[in-house]
Amino acid sequence: MTAISNHVGTIVKLNPDYTQMDAVYLTNKLLNLIGDAALDLPGDADPLTNLDLMVKAAQENGKIPDSQAARQILEAQLMDLATPTPSRINQLFWDKYQAGPRVATDWFFALSRANNYIQTRAIAKNVVFPAKTEYGDLEITINLSKPEKDPKDIAAAAHAAQSGYPACALCLQTEGYAGRTDFAARTNHRIIRFLLGGKTWGFQYSPYAYFNEHAIFLDAIHEPMVIDQSTFSNLLSIVSMFPTYFVGSNADLPIVGGSMLTHEHYQGGRHTFPMAKAPIETQVEISGHPHVFAGIVKWPMSVIRLVSADSDELINAAEHVRQVWNQYTDETVDVRAFVDGKPHHTVTPIARRVGSEFQLDLVLRDNQTSAEHPDGIFHPHQDVQHIKKENIGLIEVMGRAILPARLKSELAEVQKYLLGEANTMKPMHKTWADQLKAKYDWTPENVEAQMQAAVGRVFARVLEDAGVFKRDEVGQKAFARFCRAL
């Protein structure tokens, strides 16, 4: 079979708008993209390997330049043919939803993988391992999936005119956007529309997923993130609509928020994070909300879990906690709601359905900085920044580390150092490596497992740094004082 005929088969299989009668038409569409010389190009049974063959042929035929951006743009165009139109996708999704939410999400997830919108091969490169801690097994990932920028594309982008369209990577405007040297190709991207709080929202999957069925729920309007009572209402509405998914929001302040504060969105998916498994340590009373169970979660960060079968009462209780926290100051533990009139408090909320009940975890956040901690008082401190210095966002709050790609090679050099072998270990790891060398015996047989455990301990410390009420006696007494204010 040729690459062209194989891809025609993929298109007909995935896109109900085409049948085998369209084979000649589709063949000509493909030749227009990759060049007539590719007509007899030998194919591969694997659709993604077959895709690679066509992209390579297009480059050899002079249809695209030799750059990463050009290859990705063509990949998306070739897979766009295999993807139903946005209106058709939405019709099919909501038709399938009638048979059950899981039926619809399973179908949309499978399509988003099959059409290469979800970059399954890139995601497979990520390093993932568990790490035992006093808080349960944390999840450690070294993120290798996002491709490094091609120097040719960087140079081209520097000279390109800035259109400002799409406004950002989360906008509805990205659906079907061809892409350019400085903006990802999204021709094969599709978004499910739904109403949330009386407004149009979109539901899509993340192309570089950090966990199973990593979903993004986004406001149709490009407006900044905000955490208020409507946030809690929206999150509970989403888990009612998609009960097999959790959903949460990044905080709405710098340092403690995510990397995208300019567009209102939430993240969710079908994954049980370590924080969801963590038990309640201490029960808490929420004034005026007797039907809401509340408690402090055994977790390195400061988390209050609210549980109720009544979503309205849960929303009101969560808003009460948020409002008290947003005004709460305790100088004895460096917790300050305002400094010079500037607000520093917010929450990272996470919602789940557990049987007939709703769960809402509120993670207390404070984004102050100081001379001692210029990156953030409640942010990874300097001595752990050799492993993690970026913001602690929603996913990491829940116990899944998203560590930078540099660590794959850097930790390999640390291992060589610990084994007494020749190495090029970065100086920033030396203090930590010396502590590990003094404390443990290192052999070629145990070095990888012990290194993973050590990284897990550092990540637990990172989360403790981000916790506003520390796990020591002083911090826990301060947490109890805050809870009494509720």
Swiss-Prot record:
GO molecular function, one term: UDP-glucose:hexose-1-phosphate uridylyltransferase activity
A family per Pfam: GalP_UDP_transf
Keyword field: Carbohydrate metabolism, Cytoplasm, Galactose metabolism, Nucleotidyltransferase, Transferase
One of the GO biological process terms: galactose metabolic process
EC numbers for this chain: 2.7.7.12
GO CC annotation, single: cytoplasm
Reactions that this protein is recorded to catalyse: alpha-D-galactose 1-phosphate + UDP-alpha-D-glucose = alpha-D-glucose 1-phosphate + UDP-alpha-D-galactose
Pathway assigned in UniProt: Carbohydrate metabolism; galactose metabolism
Protein location: Cytoplasm
Family indicated by similarity: Belongs to the galactose-1-phosphate uridylyltransferase type 2 family.
NCBIfam families in alphabetical order: galT_2 (TIGR01239), PRK05270.1-3 (NF003630), PRK05270.2-2 (NF003633)
Protein name as catalogued: Galactose-1-phosphate uridylyltransferase
